[in-house]
Amino acid sequence: LRSEVRGGTAILATDAVRTPAARCLTDLDTLHLDFLQELAARTASSWARSGASLLDEWSARLAQLGDALAPPWRQRLDRAMAVLAAEPSLIASRGLAHGDFTPVNCFRQDSRLCVFDWEYAGAAYPADHDLICLLDAVARLGGDAPAARAQGLEQRLMGELGRSRNEANRRLIAFHCVHALRSLERQPSQADTGLDWYGADEAARTLDALLARASAS
């Protein structure tokens, strides 16, 4: 992995080309963990963010949505931000995030993991964002209900990856807040119906389940 910043733009380069022999890994592998660790190590000095600064940015983005955001979603996101603000250090980022780290956006080439489609890369993501992105994409293949999937991801982060209960829960909440904001920002504003997007109901149920678990912890 080569990385540098030119004129405020992050440049990442790879010399690998996907071939028919390249393998798409359909579950978490040590190659994913090694890649994410290297990405954090190489970008931490320029891209790591405190939890408080992330919350400030997300709150500003939320405010920009204005009256187009339906009251239930505003209340849900306001509640989530308040939960995260109680312990902002739990979501502090370690460096640059890919932003869309799913099995279809990476492949194994010999002993290396090659990652492409960096259009969502940036710094405004919480801790473990890319890891959760991968685990969430894998979990969706199982067809579980949102609440069950959220609980399963919490358990996997704790049991398999050594996160505390609060770390797992808050980082999942932050992950879903970021994706809700991204989805909302991509929608055209419609005065008669407000902002909406495909998958909004499922996202609401998932975030509600995580917030309920946060209250119980």
Question: Can you say where each PLM-predicted feature lies in the sequence?
Answer:
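ATP-binding pocket architecture of kinase catalytic cores
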Residues: 1-48
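Regulatory N- and C-terminal appendages and interdomain linkers associated
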Residues: 8, 199-217
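Extended charged low-complexity segments that act as oligomerization/scaffolding linkers
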Residues: 9-11, 158-172
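Short, polar/flexible loop-turn hinges at active-site or ligand-entry regions and domain interfaces
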Residues: 19-26, 122-123, 142-144
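Phosphate/pyrophosphate-binding loops and the adjoining catalytic core of nucleotide-dependent enzymes
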Residues: 22, 43-44, 167-176, 210-214
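An alpha-helical support segment within catalytic cores of ATP-dependent transferases
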Residues: 45-98
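Active-site acidic catalytic loop and adjacent metal/ATP-binding pocket
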Residues: 85-129
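Active-site activation/catalytic loop segments of kinase-like enzymes and analogous catalytic loops
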Residues: 128-162, 176-192
